[in-house]
Amino acid sequence: MTTDERMIAFGRRVREVRKAKGISQERLAEMAGIDRSYMGNIERGEKNITLKKAYEICDALEIEIQDLV
């Protein structure tokens, strides 16, 4: 799997979990301390985020990092 494929898969998983929990993209971005447009880029696999940001998203979703990879 390429890096781009991993970023896309990660973003899809973030979106799946967010929607399953009934959280809007805007609300998740706010909870994770991320700009809403940046969160959209993450969900579309357009941003190669830091591990710190990944953990902030996980904390906001109340899940473990392995749930997204």
Where are these regions (language model features)?
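Short C-terminal boundary/hinge segments that cap the last helix of small helical domains
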Residues: 62-69
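Short basic helix-loop element that most often maps to the first helix and adjoining turn
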Residues: 12-31, 56
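Recognition helix of helix-turn-helix/homeodomain-like DNA-binding domains
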Residues: 33-47
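A detector for short, charged/polar N-terminal pre-domain segments
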Residues: 1-9
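Short amphipathic helical patch at the helix-1/turn junction of helix-turn-helix
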Residues: 8, 19-20, 48
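Conserved hydrophobic/aromatic packing and binding residues within compact polymer-binding modules
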Residues: 14, 28-29, 39-42, 68
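Short, basic-rich loop-to-helix N-cap that marks the start of a DNA-contacting helix
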Residues: 46-56, 65
